A protein has these predicted regions:
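NTP/phosphate- and nucleic-acid-binding module
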Residues: 1-244
Length: 244
C-alpha cells in the first residue's frame, strides 16, 4: 500500500536557527508512507531511491547519500535494526550508489537514507529521506494475512522526495540565480511591441502562445522597447519577442 499527501508541517525552530526559505517553522512536505511485506523491502527502497534520483537529475542537482544508523535511544530489538540497516545498504549497493555512514543519526524508530543537495556555493542541504520502520506497525498493531492464512506484521517506509518544498524552491532559485531552465521558468516568453500600433498583433501572438500552453506575458507599456527589453533581461525571461 502506497499512501502520499502534500501536507503542512510545523517545527519549533529556535529563532537563531531560522534561515530564509532554508530553515523555517512551518513548511510544506511531500510525505508518503509505504506498507509492505518484509520480502518487498529491498525492491521498494530501490524504487523510491530511483524516483528521488530522477527528480534531482531532472532539476540539474548533484547530491550525496548518507545512511544514518541506530541512535543511542531507539525503539525495538537490535536484531530488527540490524536487519533494517542491512536492507538499506543492500538496496544502495545494488543500485551502485556511493554513500556515507552517519553513525547514530537514525530516527528513534528506524534507520534512514538522507539525500543532501549541493547548492551553487557548495553548501549541502538535506531534502529527500527514506526511513525504514519496523516499530510503528508494531505499535499500531498492524497486520496482514499471509499465504499461510496467519497474521503477520508489515513493514513501513516513510519517504519524502522534495522534503521541505519551500527549501527546495530556495535551493532552486540560488542554484540557477533566478535564470531557470525554459521548462520551469515562471514566464517563458515576453512579448514586446515596439509601439501601440502593433499592439493588436502582439495580442494575437500572446493568445496563440497561451493556447499552445506557453507561459507568456505581454509588456504593453508605452516606453522604448530598449527599456522593456532590459527589464526582460533583468527578470531573466528565457525569450523576449519584439513585435514591429
Amino acid at each position: 500500500i502506497r499512501m502520499g499527501e502534500i501536507g503542512r508541517v510545523h517545527r519549533h525552530e529556535l529563532s537563531g536557527a531560522l534561515h530564509g526559505l532554508m530553515r523555517v517553522r512551518a513548511f510544506t512536505q511531500d510525505d508518503a508512507h509505504i506498507f509492505m511485506l518484509p520480502e518487498q523491502i529491498k525492491d521498494e527502497i530501490k524504487g523510491v531511491v530511483s524516483l528521488i534520483d530522477k527528480i534531482y537529475k531532472t532539476f540539474g542537482f548533484s547530491y550525496h547519500l548518507e545512511l544514518s544508523t541506530r541512535p543511542e535511544k531507539f525503539l525495538g530489538e537490535i536484531s530488527m535494526w540490524d536487519e533494517a540497516e542491512s536492507n538499506l545498504k543492500a538496496a544502495l549497493e545494488e543500485l551502485g550508489l556511493p554513500y556515507i555512514i552517519n553513525e547514530g543519526d537514525g530516527a528513534f524508530y528506524g534507520p534512514k537514507i538522507d539525500f543532501h543537495l549541493r547548492d551553487c556555493i557548495g553548501r549541502t542541504w538535506q531534502c529527500g529521506t527514506i526511513q525504514l520502520d519496523y516499530q510503528l506497525p508494531e505499535r499500531f498493531e498492524l497486520s496482514y494475512i499471509g499465504k499461510d492464512g496467519e497474521k503477520h506484521r508489515p513493514v513501513m517506509i516513510h519517504r519524502v522526495a522534495f522534503g521541505s518544498i519551500e527549501r527546495f524552491i530556495g535551493i532552486l532559485i540560488e542554484h540557477y540565480a533566478g535564470k531557470f531552465p525554459l521548462w520551469i521558468a515562471p514566464v517563458q516568453v515576453k512579448i514586446l511591441p515596439i509601439s501601440d500600433k502593433f499592439m493588436d498583433y502582439a495580442k494575437q501572438i500572446e493568445k496563440a502562445m497561451y493556447d499552445a500552453k506557453i507561459r507568456v506575458e505581454l509588456d504593453g507599456r508605452a516606453v522604448k522597447i530598449a527599456y522593456n527589453s532590459s527589464v526582460a533581461r533583468l527578470e531573466k525571461v528565457p525569450y523576449a519577442v519584439g513585435v514591429g
